[in-house]
């Protein structure tokens, strides 16, 4: 995409606007300067960038740049990095979804200070009005009489009433704005699973009071193909996390998805369905599914995979995970893991003789896939190796290079850009894969890693305690 490969960490907080912090380390030729610019992902505004903000190079590490910017509206955005260095000028764009997710209460100390300042302003306004009514037309040195004092009192009362009404109306206006903001806060679409035998049907939709049943289904044409499929579905047996399936339900015409499930141990499964909407906005829809005992299963699809690690109650999994065919996935596990810290987590696939696997193949166009799942169910992330790109990033790259994205027009299903836009190079793949990730909170996590050799998709499982 660019002359330099760039690793980026972004943290944001939604409070009506989004403040993003960026830490960038280019992995190419030395960089002298770097700027960052927020732009809408699509539309006319994406063609007219604002003035860029300069990023600051570290005094101790000139290759490390840091900066921040505000995104002032919700939607699908791109953050563009423009670089100048030994290799010339270059740029990279990163898709960033910006949505309000919460309402935050004002801190009491701030509220008290603002209330005090407001009272001061009101009293000052009333005092000025009273002084004007009492003394504005007096000759210098004259003393106001009783009539002027009474008039000043009347004017002061009217001024105070005016301020009180203005404050009341302002409060009403603010409450309406807050209610509108709350109504527009981002909420993931709802995933509704239904199991008939081993036939799984999935519908994605949103509450809609205008719809006949109060619920409106999402059209499949509103979704983008990402890594060869419209939907990536993880099914993890709960609460022991001792069975995991990475499936890819096929679209059912205009709405919904379906899949003939493989043989699955009975129990309750947490479902995590990754989809990307046409505006570039990714979502992970969640639901639960109960699989009955004795369910007849179909063979796994060519792109599907599964694993049966030991249950959480059996103890923590180590840094090496033995696979059924004798291969092993080994994690270069850091000595300590802390929350909100960026890591580049490396995993190695070894053959039965303990040597690096020599027949590596891309899995869904990637060198590997990872799922980081917190054992209390509060966090899930499906990630890809360092240097890979999601569909919104591929769209940005093709637009910047003048390439057309088939399927971005019309109903969007036929010929949509898929693996051809992001296939790995024909060079031999390394048996070592690194996943950039930062654990969002302290606690216990189970990590599922998938790599492919020959025609076999391997799934390893690992446990992590994050401080």
PLM features: residue spans?
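N-terminal soluble domains immediately following signal/targeting peptides that reside
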Residues: 1-138, 143-160, 166-467
